[in-house]
Amino acid sequence: MCTPDENDYKTSTDPDTSANTNHTLEKKKRKKRKNTNVACVNCSRLHVSCEAKRPCLRCISKGLTATCVDAPRKKSKYLAGIPNRELPMSIQPDLPPRKIMIPIYNNSSNSSLNVNNMGEQQKFTSPQHIVHKAKFLSNAADSEYSILSNIIYQDTLSNKIPIDILYSNTNSTSNSTIGNSSNNSPMVTNTSPEETEMEKIRQLYSEQRANMPPHPYPSSNQNVYSILLGPNSAKIVASQVNLFANHFPLVPVDSADNSLNFKRLLPRDPSEKSSQINWDSSINQYYLNSETVTFPELAIPLKRRKNHLVSVSLESCSPDAANIKSNVGWEHSLRYSTPMEIYTSINAPFSHTPGFHHLLVYLKHRFNQQDLVKMCRSIAEFRPIFIACSVTLTEEDMIFMEQCYQRTLLEYVKFIAQIGTPTCIWRRNGQISYVNEEFEILCGWTREELLNKMTFIVEIMDDESVRDYFKTLSKVAYRDFRGSEKMKVCRLLSPIKGKIIHCCCMWTLKRDVSGLPLMILGNFMPILN
């Protein structure tokens, strides 16, 4: 039997319990709130309400039925710049039909196709376009830069390209690979009209790229050496000997008119005086380029005007128009133009031993015994360090070293193309690996003449500079780990016999992961006075 207090307590709690139960039932009986309609593009721009049907009443009244489509939903910040087809299906945004830009080339016969549709296709209203060229290999870095580019809008309108084309290879081989992978993909079962249209654009893009004239560089023949390898040049070229495995040094040639007409396909007019070569008397300036007039040809005019302030100007193409010059057959130089090719195609190390052997033979023929002893003494200083660093390296390590060399050289080539300093890159055995156009103009040797055979940097130096070369190499490569050194005077030999270019050379050394010298960059500046 309950006490009165207990009965009172039970009676007082019953109303609260029933109230809580009724409140829970009311929540369950509430209807779900309707989803908010997605506004169309026109209503979203004006920040007004819109209805679900298309076209909406507001667009009908204003005559905008053709453009009444759902406004695209904003992507998350970390997804901006990434193609929708690469996103998981669960996070792909709802987008209206895209405007697709077709790249046009002046040299393509198909450039006049669909001209009437170009005005509509070049309206870059879709967020599927970014305003910069592909400059990063990481999607995250490229996405970040695309956001910054859209904010500051510094790039030109012509640089706007679709992201779908940006992240897909444009050559025929890559297109076939992409097509096969897309057909075999388990995620895509039906091909939408939009994807079909995009595939047609890719095919047109690849066809236009294929119709572009091939770059004449590099030359597959070695006839450029028919007069540059000494008295037996013609016999050496006719024998078709491997100039990469056997060393034949470059030999300057006598020139009666102090010009390089003897090795030009289009010689300069012989009636033109050397003192009037591309000369602007109003500002005391010469205009140089790699095809008509180089710096060695101005030796005599500069001497005549040594008491006056004389300057030179280089004619060069835009860095954006310059292509990365690579050649698979040149193992000592840049072989591939993309990192993917470097890491997948290089499966053997580069042997520096033949280079050192031929370098020693060349030095024995050029210098006397006393000079050879001094050079060998400089080499002997870093020989123990070299052995200690490389004794534990395996075959796989050496393959990795060559991949690092090619990858580093690729980045340096991109950087060198943006500056105007004459630059030459050579390996630790002295074999020239890359030169830019400014270096061609400075010394008179073309890129093919220096890279189409085994060529050492000491071949184009005078005797005194070669002696300083080995002293500097010993200092910068194995004693001083600052990685830079300066040759106050470096005299370069030009193809014209007797013409020497006085320069100041700054060395920059790049090491590999084991501490060995990977490559040496030499920046050469002429000494005019």
Swiss-Prot record:
The gene is ERT1. One of its GO terms (biological process) is cellular response to starvation. Residues 40-68 bind DNA. This is Transcription activator of gluconeogenesis. Belongs to the ERT1/acuK family. The keyword Manganese does not apply. InterPro entries: ERT1_acuK_gluconeogen_tf (IPR050335), PAS (IPR000014), PAS-like_dom_sf (IPR035965), PAS_13 (IPR056751), Zn2-C6_fun-type_DNA-bd_sf (IPR036864), Zn2Cys6_DnaBD (IPR001138). It holds the Pfam family PAS_13.
